């Protein structure tokens, strides 16, 4: 077996419509086709690929107290526009430059408390 990359991220939420709005309106993903599963959800796309899957759950269950997913990360193309968009959405975030590199990072949480890292690497 060889892992070739990350296919998608799945988030369980009891706030499906608001979570869709966050990923669509704040982070700029596009809502797209989703198989006709027997449960509610949404798939959000970037560059034609469904990278965020949302599943509506009455009581989402997080990781055990023995382990945790700290965050996941997206690459972004416009650092300043991203800061402007997050500020306009009245979201709290932390932004900083990675020492010794040209990488700039922004950390923000969605309404479910999921930590998202946004990485900007100038070309």
Residue positions per predicted region:
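Exposed loop/turn and edge beta-strand positions of beta-sandwich/beta-sheet ligand-binding modules
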Residues: 5, 38, 68, 102
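N-terminal beta-strand motif that seeds the catalytic metal site of vicinal oxygen chelate
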Residues: 1-17, 48, 69-72
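Conserved catalytic-core motifs of GNAT/GCN5-like acyltransferases
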Residues: 10, 30-36, 96-99, 123
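Core segments of cupin and vicinal oxygen chelate
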Residues: 12-51
